[in-house]
């Protein structure tokens, strides 16, 4: 998830430094007790590459972060949102960033890794 945040900044975006202090939300974005289970759902944006890969409108994701996208970087398209409106994934051309940890989510995230490998 740190890479997601760094990518956003590299594209000229900004971050909330501490979600609990800077945003009102009922979503726990830092569920350290259960890092390998879904903490909340995200809504995928139809027409994005991520939506095409996953094929679902809503998926459950783990959530281990205290920072998040404030202003989205230039040229990035938001491809998933948490129920509180926080951007949880973005993309552009050959770049895909997700705020969750797909490596800890099991087989349901295999398509993300397949897309990455095929893009090499």
Predicted regions and their residues:
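Catalytic nucleophile loop
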Residues: 1-14
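Amide-donor transfer/coupling interface in amidating biosynthetic enzymes
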Residues: 20-120
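Acidic/charged, solvent-exposed loop-and-adjacent secondary-structure segments enriched in E/D, K/R, S/T
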Residues: 17
């Amino acid at each position: 998830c740190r890479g997601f945040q760094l990518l956003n900044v590299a594209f000229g975006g900004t971050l909330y430094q501490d979600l609990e202090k800077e945003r009102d939300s009922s979503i726990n974005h830092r569920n350290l007790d259960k890092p390998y289970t879904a903490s909340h759902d995200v809504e995928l944006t139809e027409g994005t590459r991520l939506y095409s890969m996953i094929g679902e409108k809503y998926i459950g994701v783990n959530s281990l972060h205290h920072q998040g996208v404030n202003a989205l970087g230039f040229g990035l398209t938001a491809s998933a949102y948490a129920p509180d409106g926080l951007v949880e994934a973005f993309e552009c051309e050959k770049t895909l960033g997700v705020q969750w940890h797909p490596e800890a989510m099991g087989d349901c995230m295999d398509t993300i890794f397949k897309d990455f490998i095929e893009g090499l």
